[in-house]
Amino acid sequence: MLNQIIARKKEHIQTLQLPDDGHFERRSFKEALVNTHRSIGLIAEVKKASPSKGIIQPNFDPLQTAKAYEKSNADCLSVLTDEPFFQGKNEYLSLIKKHIARPILRKDFIIDSIQIEESRRIGADAILLIGEVLEPQQLHELYIEAKEKGLDILVEVHAAETLEQILNLFTPEIIGVNNRNLKTFNTTVEQTKEIAPLVPKDCLLVSESGIQTFDDLTFVKKHGASAVLVGESLMREPSQEKAVQTLFGE
């Protein structure tokens, strides 16, 4: 599935035309994860569908979801913009940016510098760079370019080997451990426990995917996560605000 997604993304980039610059203000994704509302930060994801689960929220309303997250004191938002596989849109991100005060992560498969400029123009405050998708050198180059454009970067890894290759080149400020294997789609929060000791102490560690319960949250926090990225378990509920409260045991 990952290979299909990347192949489709490469095709898309061939004909990608940059949108007009929305001249959005920049908000610090990193600062929001340092100064969190709770003892562990929350990046709440606006997500309609996924290739492994299909439609997650049939009554999808991106702006209402984002407002519910903001009301529930999510520290940052993550917005899916990949259309073919996740039914996301750039327009969702821009719309949310206009109405919500939280920093926004653009959740997509960034493989080319044109997508970084696109991210800036549509209002993203941060982008995702995936270690299992990019060669370490290419990831580093895209990281530097994003920084130069005023964006924060969440560098995501699944495997220890991937993280080690990246750390041999440079140390990202924010490292995300994807608890989901992108090849098999198997998910376990044990992955955060396994990878956390390899993450430099001055990095922010984000645990991503598979966090469904207060116990999951407690587990990844205990093993060093500064923040969690949660999408599906929140999006499946009729009220995202209540879902966040339940997740945090409130």
Swiss-Prot record:
- Recorded protein name is Indole-3-glycerol phosphate synthase
What are the UniProt keywords, alphabetically?
Answer: Amino-acid biosynthesis, Aromatic amino acid biosynthesis, Decarboxylase, Lyase, Tryptophan biosynthesis
Documented EC number(s): 4.1.1.48
Q: Which GO terms describe its biological process?
A: L-tryptophan biosynthetic process
Q: Which organism is it from?
A: Bacillus pumilus (strain SAFR-032)
Supply the InterPro entries for this chain: Aldolase_TIM (IPR013785), Indole-3-glycerol_P_synth (IPR045186), Indole-3-glycerol_P_synth_dom (IPR013798), Indole-3-GlycerolPSynthase_CS (IPR001468), RibuloseP-bd_barrel (IPR011060)
Q: Which reaction does it catalyse?
A: 1-(2-carboxyphenylamino)-1-deoxy-D-ribulose 5-phosphate + H(+) = (1S,2R)-1-C-(indol-3-yl)glycerol 3-phosphate + CO2 + H2O
PANTHER family, sorted: INDOLE-3-GLYCEROL-PHOSPHATE SYNTHASE, TRYPTOPHAN BIOSYNTHESIS PROTEIN
Pathway per the UniProt entry: Amino-acid biosynthesis; L-tryptophan biosynthesis; L-tryptophan from chorismate: step 4/5
- Name the family: Belongs to the TrpC family.
GO MF terms on file?
indole-3-glycerol-phosphate synthase activity; phosphoribosylanthranilate isomerase activity
Q: Which cysteines form disulfides?
A: none
